[in-house]
């Protein structure tokens, strides 16, 4: 099975993490299906049951992120943040495991909350907290998406910007995954939101945007064959 879909942060211009309506929420999901996508990675957020229910009924596989542990002492000491992360992993899985659309649990994103400078014990414990809570061999555990891999879980994942890529893993033959790519900016007057911009690559018009996106999707097909 070849999975293809977006990293979906579930942010809204006015409600932030809260969608303005059910119709607006599922519109995004329907567009994914209309574009030929068969999965969505829910990034650093846990959605409501209605969102999952739509995915259940319409055949959209969900990769569910564990919201990353904090840094900078925002909710207490470093140790408290770590312990809270392990606990929340179990609670998130317990609260959502009944949704058949969830195909994988994603533990870590780009070393957020991993604290690699402290060694890999915390990273491995975080992965193990998800493995132990999973209780379902039919669901994958995606230990680390991007950056600091620890040879655990079912995936070997890279983040490749702007063009997609993937890595082979002859050691234990984990699933090759390009967890993130793209980041194409096209600035349109009247559709901009104030704030800093993440700039991987920028184009000046819609035709260039579409052509570049086509090149990236062609590259994905090459990776699939490899």
Predicted features, each with a name:
Residues 1-33, 53:
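N-terminal carbohydrate-binding accessory modules
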Residues 26-32, 39-226:
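Substrate-binding/catalytic cleft of secreted carbohydrate-active enzymes
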